[in-house]
Amino acid sequence: MSSKEQKTPEGQAPEEIIMDQHEEIEAVEPEASAEQVDPRDEKVANLEAQLAEAQTRERDGILRVKAEMENLRRRTELDIEKAHKFALEKFINELLPVIDSLDRALEVADKANPDMSAMVEGIELTLKSMLDVVRKFGVEVIAETNVPLDPNVHQAIAMVESDDVAPGNVLGIMQKGYTLNGRTIRAAMVTVAKAKA
């Protein structure tokens, strides 16, 4: 046989065989390079993961700080609102004994005596004016009778048997109570009805 007449599988020409073998070699080379990972690529991937983690921590930190600032702002607003709302509490507490004295003066005044009528009227007007002024600032009087005893606004002094008032209800007021913008600043001292034995 001549050198040109070599046996080829399935009638392929020698150039085709060389090309096929060359393609197989090229196909094998990428597999070999895939096994050899460039250390720089691994380092880049590691750094990217660290960067993503740091960004997530930073975002979480920023959100946490924003939430804390918002909570602080709300608390401050509430504190300021309460300070405005209840700033008068100390002043009102100092004023309550004066109001009580005017109430007691009216209770003991001889209203049937014509000589005392001008004084009684003056005390009534003074008390009314004073109560009108404190009401403008959110003060309300607790002086209702025949209502259920409420420990938030009533202080029970005694229990008295009664047919007219249901047991557990306020029978009488010994000393009026007061609230400032819904908060009790002095509980009303009351007698409470109980069933007859």
Swiss-Prot record:
Q: Mutating M174A: what's the consequence? A: No effect in ability to interact with DnaK
Which CDD domains does UniProt cross-reference here?
A: GrpE
Q: What is the effect of changing E107A?
A: No effect in ability to interact with DnaK
- Site positions for Interaction with DnaK, renumbered to this chain? R183
Query: What job does the chain carry out?
Result: Participates actively in the response to hyperosmotic and heat shock by preventing the aggregation of stress-denatured proteins, in association with DnaK and GrpE. It is the nucleotide exchange factor for DnaK and may function as a thermosensor. Unfolded proteins bind initially to DnaJ; upon interaction with the DnaJ-bound protein, DnaK hydrolyzes its bound ATP, resulting in the formation of a stable complex. GrpE releases ADP from DnaK; ATP binding to DnaK triggers the release of the substrate protein, thus completing the reaction cycle.
Q: Which family does it belong to?
A: Belongs to the GrpE family.
Q: What is this protein called?
A: Protein GrpE
Q: Which organism is it from?
A: Escherichia coli (strain K12)
Gene it is expressed from: grpE
